[in-house]
Amino acid sequence: SYQNYEIIIVDNGSNDENKSKYAELCKKNSAKYIYEKMEFNFSKMCNLGVQKASGEYYLFLNDDIEIINNEWLERMLGQAMLPHSGAVGAKLLYPNSTKIQHDGIINIENGPCHAFLGYDDKNIYYFGRNRLTYNYVAVTAACLLIRADKFNQIGGFDEDLRVAYNDVDLCFKLVEAGYYNTVRNDVILYHHESLSRGDDTANKEKMERLMREQARLYEKHKKLAKYDPFYNINLTQNAIYFSLNRSYSEVLCNEVKKSMKEYKLSGSII
């Protein structure tokens, strides 16, 4: 497995006991430990880590990600090395499960959503979207690899997006700069989602913060407001599974029926 890396842990509020454990762990593994007590701000924590990083590539990895295969980093790095590549993401499954938690982000009518969320990865979906390498408008920063100069070119994470949509904003900036964000479906990890910070929809306060951050995202990226250049306009705009838009599919069926009648063919359209 890939060995040429450094580890940087950014901690925003551990107690003294856990701080000591982290410090000892970092000492044993030649890792860097950054402690700054503050209210949770994912963007600021990532940017702090970058300030201490010396590599040519940055991997942002949540503390609730579990590694379950050996070649994941090499595969992501190989993709990130391509000149047109922006952010590289992974397929994330729920722990000890084949249910999909993340397989790319689509930006549809309801806002940015995880494609195939909750779907069983045992099945193959829309043109192998959960099997092959595909471009998406965004990927989650729970596991995101990017070349350092590209990250710095677009200004890193927006620290005004403290909790949600900071990764989407980063990816939108990459798209606007001409890069392509990608999900590598041959990189599969477990994600113990929101184990540390909790659910974004747990109460009214969190919901209001979530809506404010979405509003900021679309204010910054007006051309990408509920528009996804990597998502076919003939697909439904309010679901996550790449099904045909009802009105389009009805038109398509009628055209097929018309052709069948013209050529005197029999059969059923499903």
Show where each model-derived region lies.
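Conserved donor NDP-sugar-binding/catalytic core segment of glycosyltransferases
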Residues: 65-110
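Short aromatic/hydrophobic "clamp" motif used to bind/position activated sugar donors
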Residues: 58
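Glycine-rich, basic loop-to-helix element that forms the pyrophosphate-binding segment
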Residues: 36-53
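Active-site donor/metal-binding and catalytic loop motifs
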Residues: 69, 177-179, 184-202, 216-217
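C-terminal, non-catalytic tails of nucleotide-sugar-dependent glycosyltransferases
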Residues: 86, 96-97, 108-136, 145, ...
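A short, conserved alpha-helix in the catalytic core of glycosyltransferases
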Residues: 72-76, 135-155, 160-190
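Acidic donor-binding segment of Leloir-type glycosyltransferases
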Residues: 1-38
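Active-site acidic Asp-centered loop
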Residues: 12, 61-63, 158
